[in-house]
Swiss-Prot record:
PROSITE patterns: RIBOSOMAL_S13_1, RIBOSOMAL_S13_2. The gene is rpsM. This is Small ribosomal subunit protein uS13. The lineage of its organism: Bacteria, Bacillati, Cyanobacteriota, Cyanophyceae, Synechococcales. Keywords: Ribonucleoprotein, Ribosomal protein, RNA-binding, rRNA-binding, tRNA-binding. The keyword rRNA-binding applies. GO terms for molecular function: rRNA binding; structural constituent of ribosome; tRNA binding. It holds the Pfam family Ribosomal_S13. It comes from Synechococcus sp. (strain JA-2-3B'a(2-13)) (Cyanobacteria bacterium Yellowstone B-Prime). Belongs to the universal ribosomal protein uS13 family.
Length: 127
């Protein structure tokens, strides 16, 4: 198993797909990296030579922000929004959708499990 940016890349998958297991690398960026290193996207990870793995590691770790660094930067960006008190920061703090989606219905993923609110009780019947 090749290890790039602290992630074990799956051996049986094509390199193009295997690189997407690294946080911060999608299919497009994976193709850019392979073009830069001159590696055929259709080769399997198990067939890569040590030199090719080293070239991939150099490009990924040198030119792109991935894994822990990227997660840390995203967390800091959200924390900055919260600290300066922007609308987006308040939405993050309250755990509500940030990008203008409706919340009267839907937004269940962001709001969490539905909390039932008791309905109004009927008055007792008079005799």
């Amino acid at each position: 198993m090749a290890r790039i940016a602290g992630v074990d890349i799956p051996r049986e998958k094509r390199v193009e797909i295997a690189l997407t297991y690294i946080y911060g690398i999608g299919l497009t960026r994976s193709r850019q990296i392979l073009a830069k290193t001159g590696i055929n996207p259709d080769t399997r990870t198990r067939d890569l030579t040590d030199a090719e793995v080293a070239a991939l590691r150099t490009v990924v770790e040198g030119e792109y922000q991935v894994e822990g660094d990227l997660r840390r930067q995203e967390a800091m960006n959200i924390k900055r929004l919260i600290d300066i008190g922007t609308y987006r920061g308040r939405r993050h703090r309250l755990g509500l959708p940030v990008r203008g989606q409706r919340t009267r219905t839907n937004a269940r993923t962001r709001k969490g499990v539905r909390k039932t609110v008791a309905g109004k009780k009927k008055a007792p019947a008079k005799k």
